[in-house]
Amino acid sequence: ALTGKEFDQAIHAYETMHRECKIDLCASMGFISAEQLHRLHEAGVTSYHHNIETSRRNFPNICTTHTYDMKIETLKKVKAEGMCACSGGIIGMGETWEDRLDMAISLAELGIDSIPINALMPIPGTPLEHLPELSEPDILRTIAFFRYINPEANIRLAAGRALLTND
C-alpha cells in the first residue's frame, strides 16, 4: 500500500476526480489500514478492490509473500468502512473444483459486492506456463455456481474472456 506523501497524492487525485468528474471511484492499493480506507472514503472513493485470488486451502500454493487471512482482514475493513468491496480471483491455477467452490463461498460470507473472475492465460516463462488453458464449459460452469452462491453480487468476467465464444 502507499504511505506518506504517495498516499496523500493519491487522496488529492481521488478528491479531484470526485469533485470534477462526478464518477464512481474504486481504489486498488493492496493492504491498507482502516484509517487509510476512511480517508479514501472521505475523498469520494466508494469501492475498494482486493482479490482473494483462490481458496484458503490453495492460497499457499500461489502466494508466499502474505497470508490469506491478511486478504480477508483487508476486505472486512472495507465492509466495516461502508464501502463496496470488489474481490474475486483467478481460475485455472491448478486448483480443484472444491477450491473454486470454497472461493465462491468465502466471497459470499464476506458479502462481496463485485466479483471479478479471471481465467488464467498461461504465459511462457512464468511459473504457471505448464498449465492448460481452461475450456469454455469449465469457465461457464464456474461462472454459473459463482452466480448461484453470490446472487446479489456483480459478477465480472475479466482476464480470459478471449477463451469464450459468442455462442
Question: Could you describe each region identified by the protein language model?
Answer:
Residues 54, 121, 161:
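Flexible, active-site-proximal loop/turn residues at the rims of small-molecule/cofactor binding pockets
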Residues 1-78, 83-88, 113-118:
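Core AdoMet radical
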Residues 69-127, 138-158:
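Conserved C-terminal portion of the radical SAM core fold
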Residues 8-9, 31-32, 69, 98, ...:
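Residue-level recognition of alpha-helix initiation/capping sites
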Residues 32-42, 92-108, 162-167:
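Catalytic cores of alpha/beta
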Residues 24-28, 154-159:
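Short catalytic-loop micro-motif centered on adjacent basic/acidic residues
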Residues 2-5, 65, 91-96, 123, ...:
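Short, small-residue-enriched loops and turns at beta-alpha junctions
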Residues 27-32, 128-134:
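Short, exposed beta-strand "edge-strand" segments with a Pro/Gly-rich flavor and a Y/T-containing core
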